[in-house]
C-alpha cells in the first residue's frame, strides 16, 4: 500500500492548478481546479455526481443491479453499469476495495457528512493524501446547498446553481402548503417498510425527513438508533395508531395489504389511502436519501394535501426528469413512474 501513497503524493504535487473550498463540515479542502476523476463513497453523493459531472465518476459504491436502483431503468445511463463497484461507507457498508479504487486515481472523494461514518472515511483517505469533501444531505431542506456544494467540488457551479434554484422553488411551494395547515389538522401517516410492513422510521430520523417536510402527524415518535433505521413495530401498535394514510416502500406489502385481514380494519386501508413509493430510477423519498426527494416531497404533498396541491404532478415529474436526469418523459410515462 506504500507505493500507492507515494503515487498519490506525486500526483497531487504535480497538480499545478488547485483551489481551496470549504465543505459542508466546515473543513478547508484543496481540490483540483479541473476534476477529471471522482469517487463518491455513498449513494447520495454518487447520485449528485451523476447529475452534475457523470464523466468524472470512476467507480460505483453500489452496483446498478442492487435493490437501490430500479431494475432496467431507462432514466440512468447504461454506462454506470460498466464502472467497477468498490464499496463505500454507508448503511451497513463500511469500507471500499482500496486497491481497486486507488488504481482508478480519484482526485477527490465526495463523502457523506454523517456522524456514523465521517471519522472512518477521513482517516482512510488521509493516508493517501486524497482530499475528502463532506456533503450534508440528511434532510430534504439540505438538497439545494448539497447540490451547490457538490458543484463547487466538481467544478460544475453553473449547472449546480440551475438545479439548486429549481430545487428551492419546488421546496418553497411545498413548504407554503405545509405551513398553511395547522398541525392538529394534518393527517396521521405511517411509513411502512419491509415485506410485512412492520418496519418504519422514527419521526426524528433523516429517513423520515420528506414526511416531516411535507407536514404530517407521524404515527410513531422515537430516536434513530443506527444509520440504517428500520425500527420494528408490531401490528397492535399500528392498530392503536390507526393512521389516515400509509406510504409503503415495499411492493410486495403494497400488493398484499388490500387482502390481508390484519390490516383490513385500518382507516387508511378502508379509505384506499395506501400508496406505493415511486422508485424509478431510485426511491424518491428514501434509501438512498437523494436529490430525488425534491420531487418526492411534491409527490407526497399531492397525495397527503391534495386540496392544497394545485400543480399538475405529472408536469412536475416530467420537468424534473428532464432537468435533473436529462431524460424526456411523456405524460403517460410520468403517470406510470409515480403511480398515477
Annotated model-derived regions:
Residues 203-229:
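Alpha-helical, coiled-coil/dimerization segments enriched in small aliphatic residues
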Residues 46-102, 108, 112-114, 219:
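A short, structured surface patch at a secondary-structure boundary
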Residues 39-41, 58-61, 108-112, 132-136, ...:
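Structural recognition of the beta-strand scaffold that forms the well-ordered cores
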Residues 16-18:
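Boundary at the C-terminal end of the N-terminal hydrophobic targeting segment
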Residues 21, 119-199, 228, 278-340:
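Extracytoplasmic substrate-binding proteins
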Amino acid at each position: 500500500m506504500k507505493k500507492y501513497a507515494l503515487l498519490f503524493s506525486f500526483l497531487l504535487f504535480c497538480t499545478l492548478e488547485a483551489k481551496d473550498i470549504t465543505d459542508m463540515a466546515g473543513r478547508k479542502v484543496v481540490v483540483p481546479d479541473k476534476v477529471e476523476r471522482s469517487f463518491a463513497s455513498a449513494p447520495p453523493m454518487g447520485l449528485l455526481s451523476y447529475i452534475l459531472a457523470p464523466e468524472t465518476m470512476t467507480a460505483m459504491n453500489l452496483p446498478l443491479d442492487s435493490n437501490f436502483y430500479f431494475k432496467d431503468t431507462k432514466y440512468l445511463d447504461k454506462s454506470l453499469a460498466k464502472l467497477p463497484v468498490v464499496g463505500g461507507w454507508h448503511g451497513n457498508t463500511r469500507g471500499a476495495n482500496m486497491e481497486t479504487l486507488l488504481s482508478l486515481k480519484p482526485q477527490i472523494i465526495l463523502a457523506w457528512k454523517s456522524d456514523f461514518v465521517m471519522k472512518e472515511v477521513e482517516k482512510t483517505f488521509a493516508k493517501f493524501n486524497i482530499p475528502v469533501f463532506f456533503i450534508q444531505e440528511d434532510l430534504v431542506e439540505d438538497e439545494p446547498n448539497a447540490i451547490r456544494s457538490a458543484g463547487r467540488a466538481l467544478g460544475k457551479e453553473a449547472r449546480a446553481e440551475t438545479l439548486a434554484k429549481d430545487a428551492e422553488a419546488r421546496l418553497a411551494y411545498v413548504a407554503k402548503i405545509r405551513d398553511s395547515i395547522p398541525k392538529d389538522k394534518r393527517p396521521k401517516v405511517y411509513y411502512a417498510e419491509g415485506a410485512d410492513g412492520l418496519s418504519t422510521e422514527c419521526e426524528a430520523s433523516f429517513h423520515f425527513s420528506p414526511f416531516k417536510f411535507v407536514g404530517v402527524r407521524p404515527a410513531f415518535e422515537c430516536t434513530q438508533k443506527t444509520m440504517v433505521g428500520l425500527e420494528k413495530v408490531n401490528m397492535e401498535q399500528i392498530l392503536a395508531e390507526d393512521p389516515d394514510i400509509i406510504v409503503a416502500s415495499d411492493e410486495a406489502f403494497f400488493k398484499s395489504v388490500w387482502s390481508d385481514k390484519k390490516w383490513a380494519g385500518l382507516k387508511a386501508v378502508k379509505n384506499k389511502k395506501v400508496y406505493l413509493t415511486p422508485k424509478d430510477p431510485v426511491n424518491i423519498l428514501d434509501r438512498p436519501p437523494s436529490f430525488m426527494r425534491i420531487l418526492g416531497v411534491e409527490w407526497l404533498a399531492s397525495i397527503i394535501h391534495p386540496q392544497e396541491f394545485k400543480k399538475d404532478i405529472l408536469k412536475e415529474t416530467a420537468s424534473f426528469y428532464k432537468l435533473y436526469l436529462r431524460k424526456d418523459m411523456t405524460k403517460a410515462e410520468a403517470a406510470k413512474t409515480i403511480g398515477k
